[in-house]
UniProtKB/Swiss-Prot annotation:
One of its GO terms (biological process) is translation. Belongs to the bacterial ribosomal protein bL9 family. Keywords: Ribonucleoprotein, Ribosomal protein, RNA-binding, rRNA-binding. SUPFAM superfamilies: L9 N-domain-like, Ribosomal protein L9 C-domain. One of its GO terms (cellular component) is ribonucleoprotein complex. The keyword Ribonucleoprotein applies. This is Large ribosomal subunit protein bL9. NCBIfam families: L9. Binds to the 23S rRNA. GO terms for molecular function: rRNA binding; structural constituent of ribosome. Gene3D superfamilies: Ribosomal protein L9, C-terminal domain (3.10.430.100), Ribosomal protein L9, N-terminal domain (3.40.5.10). The gene is rplI.
């Protein structure tokens, strides 16, 4: 299906371009979200008549996004979550959680603007891209920790998930002897 793009769409094209896409993608995403029009003769004429307005509106949105990007780029946000000793979270951190934390800090960012391929499931520092506008993208750092003290340690570069290394002999167990005893017991039964 041919559509006319009303704004820049990543990996597809710039505003005003006529592109050929699959019908489902056009109907369910591009047309539904107002990012494109069907490429009919009437729509082409309508688009050309309104092109200046659309470009002005796009430029205004990009400038607003650029202003927010200057303040947001490189910022670090702390999320406190419960996790096991190995650093694996009970649950995960999704775009909704990220949007809440960033909004509490005074930035206007929606959950759909965060680019996460999969939810975050471990403690530590994670760099997350934020697409404020199709032409403006910044990166923020999310510090996921079990407590504010741990977050400070992680920010300094310390690992909070180091497991203590131990040897079975240090525990007072004689592995060889335990196996030998188990083997003798098996002979007595049979």
């Amino acid at each position: 299906m041919e559509v006319i793009l009303l704004e820049r769409v990543a990996k597809l094209g710039q505003m005003g371009e006529t592109v050929n896409v699959r019908p489902g993608y056009a109907r369910n995403f591009l047309l539904a979200r107002g990012k494109a029009l069907r490429a009919t003769e009437n729509n082409k004429k309508h688009f050309e008549a309104q092109r200046a307005q659309l470009e002005a509106r796009n430029l205004e949105r990009r400038n607003e996004a650029q202003t927010v990007a200057e303040k947001l780029d490189g910022q670090s946000f702390v999320l406190i979550r419960q996790s096991g000793e190995t650093g694996v979270l009970y649950g995960s951190v999704s775009t909704r959680d990220l949007a809440e934390v960033v909004t509490k800090e005074g930035f206007s960012v929606e959950r759909g603007q965060f680019v996460l391929n999969q939810p975050i499931k471990t403690l530590g520092l994670h760099t997350v891209p934020v697409t404020l506008h199709p032409e403006v993208e910044v990166k923020v750092t999310v510090n996921i920790a079990r407590s504010p003290e741990e977050a400070e340690r992680q920010a300094r570069g310390e690992s909070v998930t180091e497991r203590e290394q131990f040897n079975l002999d240090d525990l007072g167990l004689e592995v060889g002897q335990a196996l030998a005893d188990a083997g003798e017991g098996a002979d007595d039964r049979g």
